[in-house]
Amino acid sequence: MSKKHILILLCLWHAMVVSAQDEERPIGGPSEKKGFMFGLNIGYLMPNDEPATFYDGKPKEQGFLDLNAFLGQWFIRDQVINTLGDRAANYRLSEYPQDYRYNNALAIGGHVRYQFNWTHAVVADMNFARLRSAGIFVIEYPGTTGLTQPVFESFEITGEEDRMNLSLGYQVALGAPSEFGVHLEFGPLLTSVNVRNNQFRIGDQTYSILRAQTVGQAPDQLINGQITTVSSVGGYGQLGTNLEFHKFTLDMALRVSLEKIALYAGQEAKFRPNYQPFLRLIYQLSGSGS
């Protein structure tokens, strides 16, 4: 987690707590907390890295160019050589990205629940995150003389996607009503992934490799095929603490979700764990606490 993201989370957490402490909720029996509640979520998504291999440039689907074939197109070669110089006239791809992975990302969203009493609630969340993935590939070309070692240059290839999670769950409080409590929550989860781009940069030139393919007999044209939004159903569970105030509840929890994401035909669609620590500030609009 970067220092910038840590600072953002701490500032928001402080603002939430200060706002919620204006009025404390009188603690009573289980019926004191009842009715509809709405709120905001902010978390830090740590996704499973396996689906990210869609963006690493390695051979995937027939008919689409992998990184090696893309760099081998004569007009792409001309552009790369113009950037790197004539010394790179005989360049080749030396190494595909290794250990390709997502970067962790900030996730934000909304929350709604119906609280039956202090102990039981039905909850729903919708969270959004923009994920970026990155890896390094290596280009090799001969040295300036036949006696020198080959020259290796490294470049970054990246992918970017929007991910949405929609969950419907059941929350149960573990223990008697209190200003400080522990809760367990679980339920089904719908995940949707919208791929935005897959590209790399050499010098000032950016190349899009997202489902790149040649155009018929055209010798110098490439197009990028579209990829539809990928959706799947999984599940989640979370364990956390909650602070109770007059009309506010502040949840602090760790959510573990099992999501079945496959971004290309050859990728196995299996449940993979994703982790998300988060804060959730909820305000009670109706019921006994108002």
Per-range role (PLM):
Residues 42-48, 126-132, 172-174, 188-194, ...:
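Transmembrane beta-strands of outer-membrane beta-barrel pores
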